[in-house]
Amino acid sequence: MAATSLLYNQLKAAEPFFLLAGPNVIESEEHILRMAKHIKDISTKVGLPLVFKSSFDKANRTSSKSFRGPGMAEGLKILEKVKVAYDLPIVTDVHESSQCEAVGKVADIIQIPAFLCRQTDLLVAAAQTGKIINIKKGQFCAPSVMENSAEKIRLAGNPNVMVCERGTMFGYNDLIVDPRNFEWMREANCPVVADITHSLQQPAGKKLDGGGVASGGLRELIPCIARTAVAVGVDGIFMEVHDDPLSAPVDGPTQWPLRHLEELLEELIAIARVTKGKQRLQIDLTPYRD
């Protein structure tokens, strides 16, 4: 618990923001280790605290034919190797209460997927690991819902919680990001994270050659959403990064190219350093007098 509290306080105090980044899913041990090295080198160079992210199982896929990953047992072994080899904290997601104990032995941050952000039993099981809990806001939820989700973590005895904006459904096959949510989600009284890659998904918006659909996305707009988020003053940036996005087995259209990671982060840091987004403006409504 002491190590968890230390990491949580370090992330809360990070200036101008902290980074949760990595490939969407574990494709192989070799690929994950290589990506962890590159992303750590870049984050160290630009001066951002990094928590490395990847998933062991993509349980919520559009198609049953979609790649899911190596599974929990093998995936956690690989993430443990990343943790040891590069001295990096780890964030990964859970989908069932039964996974939380095992995941909590490896992950420093347990992530609750957006579609599961209201699942009380899952939130409580994750909280009881004592690890930091990152709750993604459901695409169907108002930002105020995250106050309740965060409170479920605290009532389970765990004060180490953060909430994450990842877009809102806008009709079929599309998401939008409402920048007001970055401000309103602060009412959860915890760090606010912006997922700048999943926010550009187009769910089930890509037709496959063999029939069926998969998630598409608008990768070219990732910088737009990222600039907005850091200007508003979010505490953390979540992003998925890949060295070959066109060949990525999952969410390729919304993974940011590794070759452009340093360039984007440098720009975001520059924006974050000049904005006063983390300082709430006190509005004086008394009558103006000369």
Curated annotation (Swiss-Prot):
List the InterPro entries: Aldolase_TIM, DAHP1/KDSA, KDO8P_synthase
**Could you tell me which Gene3D superfamilies the record lists for this protein?**
Aldolase class I
Tissues where this protein is expressed: Expressed in shoots.
Temperature behavior is:
Optimum temperature is 65 degrees Celsius.
Q: Where is this protein chiefly located?
A: cytoplasm
Q: Where in the cell is it found?
A: Cytoplasm
Q: Which UniProt keywords apply?
A: Acetylation, Cell wall biogenesis/degradation, Cytoplasm, Transferase
One Gene Ontology cellular component: cytoplasm
Where N-acetylalanine occurs, residue numbers?
2
- Swiss-Prot/TrEMBL GO biological process terms: monosaccharide biosynthetic process; pollen tube development; pollen tube growth; rhamnogalacturonan II biosynthetic process
Q: How does activity depend on pH?
A: Optimum pH is 6.5-9.5.
Q: Does the keyword Transport apply?
A: no
EC number(s) recorded for this UniProt protein? 2.5.1.55
Q: Which reaction does it catalyse?
A: D-arabinose 5-phosphate + phosphoenolpyruvate + H2O = 3-deoxy-alpha-D-manno-2-octulosonate-8-phosphate + phosphate
Instruction: Kindly list the GO molecular function terms attached to this UniProt entry.
Output: 3-deoxy-8-phosphooctulonate synthase activity
Q: Does the keyword Cell wall biogenesis/degradation apply?
A: yes
List the NCBIfam families hit by this protein, alphabetically.
KDO8P_synth, PRK05198.1
* UniProt family annotation: Belongs to the KdsA family.
What function is annotated for this protein?
Catalyzes the stereospecific condensation of D-arabinose 5-phosphate and phosphoenolpyruvate to form 3-deoxy-D-manno-octulosonate 8-phosphate (KDO-8-phosphate) and inorganic phosphate. Involved in the biosynthesis of 3-deoxy-D-manno-octulosonate (KDO) which is an indispensable component of rhamnogalacturonan II (RG-II), a structurally complex pectic polysaccharide of the primary cell wall. RG-II is essential for the cell wall integrity of rapidly growing tissues and pollen tube growth and elongation.
This chain belongs to the protein called: 2-dehydro-3-deoxyphosphooctonate aldolase 1
Gene name linked to the record: KDSA1
